[in-house]
């Protein structure tokens, strides 16, 4: 059976290892090679491929060292500047990995070359979304604009509600503190925060999250919600006439929160 395990890196990154009981492994966004090499050795795994969501160094910094030890395919966006990519991808492509395959979704906003990978693994839908969607949050807009990012998030919102979300950072508690500021009376936010505080106190990741639950407490997926819009209006001093305006206002608020 295939399982998905987090490999912690740096202060708050997760490199996701998709591994089969036959000893094959694919890793997502290896910003650091050393923890991946240790994980492979300790679990007697053979690296079969590297999946990249975007070009930032904390997601790609370990690629060349891994390739020096394991010459495997590197998957990434077709117009990315990452030189190590050997299998360029675009929207709708499928990546065949052993007994399963992942669909490529273009999700720009955080960066222009950002893609996500979605598919059924071990009987459940899974999404590897890098820095586009976080639990209770979303990525900063380093290269894209609010309309672009909101379009990407809307694309992800349309995935099945039982989709497990494997994002690349342990930002959940920080994001939930912001969500409480946006929706101070939300039972869903408060419940999720208590759950995650308990997990982190035991050293357990808050991920994967579940998409159908995120839609109830992630303010960046709730730009149409009247409470979110009202708080965006108060903080920004603008009318927030559209959901994209609301999204832009709360993203700017989060940047300085």
From Swiss-Prot:
Keyword entries, A-Z: Hydrolase, Metal-binding, Zinc
SUPFAM superfamilies listed in its UniProt record: Metallo-hydrolase/oxidoreductase
Function: Thiolesterase that catalyzes the hydrolysis of S-D-lactoyl-glutathione to form glutathione and D-lactic acid.
Pathway of action: Secondary metabolite metabolism; methylglyoxal degradation; (R)-lactate from methylglyoxal: step 2/2
Annotated protein name in UniProt: Hydroxyacylglutathione hydrolase
InterPro entries assigned: Clx_II_MBL, Glyoxalase_II_hydrolase, HAGH_C, Hydroxyacylglutathione_Hdrlase, Metallo-B-lactamas, RibonucZ/Hydroxyglut_hydro
Cofactor field: Zn(2+)
EC number assigned by the record: 3.1.2.6
Positions contributing to Zn(2+) 2 binding: 58-59, 131, 169
Binding site for Zn(2+) 1: 54, 56, 110, 131
Oligomer status and interactors: Monomer.
Family in the record: Belongs to the metallo-beta-lactamase superfamily. Glyoxalase II family.
Gene responsible for this protein: gloB
Cofactor binding mode and count: Binds 2 Zn(2+) ions per subunit.
């Amino acid at each position: 059976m295939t399982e998905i395990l987090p490999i912690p890196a740096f202060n708050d990154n997760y490199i996701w290892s998709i591994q089969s009981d036959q000893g094959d492994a694919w890793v997502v966004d290896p910003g650091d090679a050393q923890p991946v090499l240790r994980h492979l050795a300790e679990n007697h795994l053979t690296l079969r491929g590297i999946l990249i969501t975007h070009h930032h160094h904390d997601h790609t910094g370990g690629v060349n060292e891994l390739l020096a030890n394991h010459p495997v395919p590197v998957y990434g966006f077709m117009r990315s500047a990452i030189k190590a990519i050997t299998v360029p991808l675009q929207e709708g492509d499928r990546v065949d990995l052993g007994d399963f395959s992942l669909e490529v979704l273009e999700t720009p906003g955080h960066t222009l070359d950002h893609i996500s990978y979605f598919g059924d693994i071990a009987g459940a839908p899974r999404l590897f979304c890098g820095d586009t969607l976080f639990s209770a949050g979303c990525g900063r807009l380093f290269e894209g604009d609010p309309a672009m990012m909101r379009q990407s998030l809307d694309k992800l919102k349309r995935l099945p509600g039982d989709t497990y979300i494997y994002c690349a950072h342990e930002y959940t508690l920080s994001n939930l503190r912001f969500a409480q500021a946006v929706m101070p009376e939300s039972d869903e936010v408060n419940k999720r925060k208590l759950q995650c505080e308990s997990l982190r106190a035991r050293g357990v990741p808050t991920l994967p999250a579940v998409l159908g639950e995120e839609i109830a407490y992630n303010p960046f997926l709730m730009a149409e919600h009247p409470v979110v819009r009202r708080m965006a209006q108060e903080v920004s001093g603008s009318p927030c006439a559209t959901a994209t305006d609301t999204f832009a206002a709360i993203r700017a608020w989060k940047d300085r929160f």
